[in-house]
Amino acid sequence: MGERKQPVKTAVAAASEELMVVQTMGGRMQVRWDETAQATPHGQLVFFAEFLAAAGVFERWVDACPLHYTSPNASGKRDVLGTLMLGVLAGSRRYAHIAGVRGDAVAAQALGLKGIVSEDSVRRALKAMAPESSEPWMRDALLHSVRDSLERPWVLDLDATIKPLYGRQEGAEVGYNPHKPGRPSHVLHTFWVGNLRLVLDAVLTSGKQHTSRHGKAPLRRLLDELGDKAPALVRGDCGYGNEDMLDICEQRGLPYLFRLRQTKNVKRLIERLFRREDWTRASEATQGWQAIEDSIRLVGWSQARRVIVLRRRMKQDTALTAKQDDGQLVLALPHDAVEDNAQLWEYTVLVTNAPYEIAAIGQLYRDRCDCENGFDELKNQWGWGGFSTHDMHRSQITARAVALVYNWWSWYVRAANPGARREALTSRPLLLAAVGRATSHAGQTTLYLTPMHANTGLIKTMVANVHAAIRYVRQAAEQLPQLDRWAALLRYICQRIVGPSALPTPPPALAAPG
C-alpha cells in the first residue's frame, strides 16, 4: 500500500511546483506556488511590535508567565504567547484559526519568536499552567495595561455578558440568555474604564452565575488592587442596584450610580412622584427626559438613599397589546381616538450618592451604554465569543488574554488617531493589513509594504503619530534610565486624547510699595 501511495505524493508535489496557467476574466495569468518567500498579509504588525517593544509590556507579560516545560523539545513560552497574540490580532475566534498564521515568518521575526507554534501547542501550554499561578499573572497584566492611565477622574462600569456554548464544556449551564434562550452558556463579569472602553478585569463563571452577587468578590479585589487609582464613580445597570453593591461602594467612600429594578415599592414611588410639579423641563440636551429627586428605603436596604426618577414621553402611534385567556394577542387600545389621547411615559429610576445636579445624572447614566459597544466589539470582532475548551480554566485565561491584546491594540490605535476611537473592524485594515515582503542582505532585513487600503496617506499619518509617541518615550528614557516607559507612553497618549489642560489663572499682582 505504501508503494502505491508514494508515486501519488510525488506527483502532487511535482504538480505544485509546476507553472500553472489560469484563464481569468481579466486575461491569462501564470501562477506558481512559493512557500519559501518571507511574506506576510499583516505587514504593519512591525509598527505594533515596535510599540510593544518600546514600552516593554510584551516582555513583561512573557517573563511573568508561569509556564515551565522540562522537555528541551517543547515550545518556549514566548513562542506560545506570541502565537496566541498574533492569532487574536488576526481575528481568530477558535484555536483552529491559529493555523491561518502558522506560516507567517515575518510576524514571528517581528515579535522575536523562534517560530509560530501549532494550535495544539497553545492548548497544551495553557492547560499546563496551574490556576493558582495563572490567575494572578493574567490579572496583573490586564490591570497593568490600564492602571497608569487612571490619574484623571474616571468611571468604573460594571456589566456582564453572556457567552453561548455549543459543546459539553465545564460550567455550561442553562441560565439567563436573552439572545439564545435555552442555550447553555458562560458569563463574563467585566469591569470597564468608561469612555476609554478598556478592560480592567474579566471573570468567567458558569451560566447560572449571572447575577451581580457573583461579581462582588472580584469587585472588592479590583478596588483593593487599584489603591489610590480608585474611580470617581462606579456605574451599573439594574442588576447592580442592590444592598451588597451599594455597601461595597459606601464602605470605600466611592460615589455610585445604579439603576433600580421596577419592583412594587419603586412603582409606588413613581406613582407618588407623577403628580408633583417640580419635574425638570425636557429639552434637546436631555434627549426628552425629565427628572425629579427623592429618597427611598427598599426592602433589604440598611438605610434610605437618594434616587433620581427619569421619565420621557413616548412617541405617538404606539400600539399596546394584551393577551386573552386563550393566548390570542389583541390590541389593548382598539380605538384610534383613545390611543391618540393617551399619554405614555417611559420611566427609569436611579440610585446614587454622587454630588451631581439632577440634570447631569441622566446623561451620566446614558453614557453607560458605551460599554455595550465594547462587548459587541470584543465578542464579534475579537475572540470573546470563542476559544472554548472543555475546562473553564483555559477559557478564563484566553478571555483575559483577548482583553489584554485588545487593550494594547486600543492604546496603539489611540496613539495613531487620538481624536477618535476606531473599532477593530476599521483599525485592522488601516493599521495591520498590508502585504509585506522581507529580504535579507548582509545581516539587514528590509520589509517592503504594499497597503491594500485606499487611504494610504491616512495610514502614513497614523504611523507617524505612533512614531512620535515612541520617540517621546525613548528620549525620556535616555534622560531617566529608571523611567517606567509604559506609564510614560500612556500619559503621552492620554494627553493627546484630552488635549492640553487649561493653564491656572495667575494670582493678582501685588500693589507697588509706597
Go through the PLM ranges and name each one.
Residues 231-241:
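Acidic/histidine-rich, metal-coordinating catalytic segments
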Residues 65-72, 358-365, 381-397, 412-425, ...:
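Short, solvent-exposed helix-loop connector elements
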Residues 1-225, 249, 436-514:
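Dynamic "connector" segments at or just before major functional cores
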Residues 106-108, 163-165, 198, 209, ...:
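Flexible loop/turn segments at secondary-structure boundaries
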Residues 51, 98, 288, 358-401, ...:
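Short amphipathic alpha-helical "interface-anchor" segments enriched in bulky aromatics
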Residues 227, 246-255:
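Short, surface-exposed basic-aromatic patches at helix termini and helix-loop junctions that form
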Residues 3-4, 15-31, 255-374, 380, ...:
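An anionic, glycine-rich sequence signature occurring as long contiguous blocks
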